[in-house]
UniProtKB/Swiss-Prot annotation:
Organism: Francisella tularensis subsp. mediasiatica (strain FSC147)
Enzyme class per UniProt: transferase
Keyword set includes Transferase: yes
Record GO cellular component, one term: cytosol
UniProt cross-references to Pfam families, sorted A to Z: GCV_T, GCV_T_C
Protein's UniProt keywords contain Transcription: no
Protein name from the UniProt record: Aminomethyltransferase
Reaction(s) catalysed (UniProt annotation): N(6)-[(R)-S(8)-aminomethyldihydrolipoyl]-L-lysyl-[protein] + (6S)-5,6,7,8-tetrahydrofolate = N(6)-[(R)-dihydrolipoyl]-L-lysyl-[protein] + (6R)-5,10-methylene-5,6,7,8-tetrahydrofolate + NH4(+)
Protein family according to the UniProt entry: Belongs to the GcvT family.
Amino acid sequence: MLKTPLYESHIAANAKMVDFSGWSMPINYGSQIQEHNNVREDCGIFDVSHMLAVDIQGSEAEKFLRYLLANDIAKLQENKAQYGCMLNHDAGIVDDLITYKVTDEHFRIVVNAGNRESDVAWFNQNAQNFDVAITPQTDLAIVAVQGPKAVAVIKRVVTKEIAAEIEALLPFSFKFFSKWMVARTGYTGEDGFEVILPATQVKKFWDSLLENGAQPAGLGARDTLRLEAGMHLYGADMDTSTTPLERGLGWSVDLSDEHRDFIGKKAYLAKKAQGVDTKWVGVVLKTKGVLRAGQEIDFDNGEKGYITSGSFSPTLKVAIGLAYVPKQADNPVVNIRGKELEVELVKPKFVKNGKSLI
């Protein structure tokens, strides 16, 4: 099984390790709920070095990425980041990812752990007619520093000059400090940073964060945090069989430049014209019980919806989920252990900056 540069640190902290896309990763360090709450109230740190930073460089880097991605990176300024989907020719989602613009000829993309090899292969397959170099940065590590006290913690472990620059970063902006890249991005619904740095330096950085008030958090808390924030998980909430239209991600497909072609555009426009018969929603269980991926939602007209992600919400103290359901249907219920339990359909975002949105 693959190991991140922080593997020994996780073992020393008595983390429970699990197989995640072939990587041995910490699911928790004791109490998943405590780790979750710590990120909502204080500062938690995550080892996400199983994800991969890929640099796209060359005179046609922007031209290539405008073709590769459904969002339009031509609108990105230097030191800004953008969320978007990478589609196949049928408009199915190959991956969702964040693109960082370093210069007009240098971009960095961070891809999901389970798609590392397939994404890089897809990049290379589609780059053959462009003057670009694609470089997976396998010698880098990634640490997410998340929570309302993330700024305070990170300021304690860097110089005053760097601290001021990090604190000044706006959401979805980033800056390089030598070989370190610090971005004000995250996957929790809280303020925070994602730090991409040389793997040889990550243990010292991790230890410094812990010594200055941060607490480690595992993939279990990362999943409940992103679920509360209404953020998609690739492979659960969407995959190549789904388009952005069915998953509430149409906003991330930029059609404003009608002259721009991108992979999947023709199929996407056809699907958009045809319309989709489902909508993307949040689900809240009104009674005790647990919502899980794969559960059916039944409606009184006989139609069904399906939960793609579900869990107990430590912040809201109820079960929540993300689901696709018929556009017109009433009185939703889920069947849990032979009982029909009422659920409420809400906007697919439950918590922002520690506050309930439902």
